Design a protein with these regions (language model features):
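Small-residue-rich helix-loop
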Residues: 1-127
């Protein structure tokens, strides 16, 4: 983790996707006897729902429609950066966590692809 400023606006700031996924995984862990799980669990409730609330209300059409109502995620958009990190319930009822980050000249064009990737996790049958 590299934090050059307190706002997250510096191009030198860097937070690895794995850190975001690890935080989400700890929050979603089934064992609530873990103190960190109990402390982080409220974070999941506040995540926007695909096609329904917050920054995801107008998203998840077309190829990503399968994620509507299933994907819960926080979006992040800055100049040249687009991210989506959250949870999705897969076809077998497991909670999966994900953190997708893109860095390029046109983050808006990447947004539907991030949505489609998160929605694809819904149909995952990992057994």
């Amino acid at each position: 983790v590299t934090l050059m400023d307190g706002s997250g606006l510096s191009v030198q700031d860097a937070v690895p996707a794995m850190l975001l996924a690890d935080l989400l995984s700890a929050a979603a862990a089934p064992d609530e006897s873990q103190r960190r799980t109990t402390a982080l669990r409220p974070m999941l409730v506040g995540l926007p729902v695909a096609g329904s609330s917050g920054t995801l209300a107008e998203r998840y059409d077309g190829p990503a429609a399968g994620g509507r109502g299933w994907v819960r995620a926080k979006t992040g958009t800055l100049t040249g950066v687009n991210s989506l990190a959250g949870t999705v319930l897969d076809a077998e009822g497991r909670v999966l966590v994900f953190a997708l980050l893109s860095n390029g000249p046109n983050p808006v064009s990447v947004r539907p692809r991030l949505d489609a990737l998160a929605a694809a996790l819904r149909s995952c049958g990992c057994h």
